[in-house]
Swiss-Prot record:
One of its GO terms (molecular function) is structural constituent of ribosome. This is Large ribosomal subunit protein uL11. HAMAP family: Ribosomal_uL11. The gene is rplK. Forms part of the ribosomal stalk which helps the ribosome interact with GTP-bound translation factors.
Length: 141
């Protein structure tokens, strides 16, 4: 018999540095799963991506078991790193805080493609370009 899915919990945590403290503890504790087992598994899986925020999707089952699936870092995070900035513009349409090239845009789109609702790389590029525009990052050829 298949296990019954109870909940899907989505968290954004620093890679390799998850702890049982909030937000992890309260989010997972209410479903009765072993928090330390999750923290250990997450830190092992995300150790290679140190320094970035790595979203995780945790499927919790009725027998208190779980499956953690790592997603790609948020587009805004990848864009900030590519542009070499700390944060986006406070007034995006009026001010430009950084620039990225088309090649960098394509690389970010390729990295994000598995987690995006896009059919091809061009559609993914347009989505990432929109995120860049809303952050005040200009795309140059």
């Amino acid at each position: 018999m298949a296990k019954k899915l109870v909940a899907v919990v989505k968290l954004q945590l620093p890679a390799g540095k998850a702890t049982p403290a909030p937000p992890v503890g309260p989010a997972l504790g209410q479903y009765g799963i072993n928090i330390m087992a999750f923290v250990k598994e997450y830190n092992e899986k995300s150790a290679s991506q140190a320094g970035s925020i790595v979203p995780v999707e945790i499927s919790v089952y009725s027998d208190r078991s779980f499956v953690a699936r790592l997603l790609t870092p948020p587009a805004a995070d990848l864009l900030r790193k590519a542009a070499g900035i700390q944060k986006g513009a406070s007034t995006p349409k009026r001010t430009t805080v950084g620039t990225i090239t088309r090649a960098q845009l394509r690389q970010i789109a390729q990295q994000k493609l598995p987690d995006m609702n896009a059919n091809d790389i061009e559609a993914a590029e347009r989505i990432i370009a929109g995120t860049a525009r809303s952050m005040g990052i200009k795309i140059v050829e």
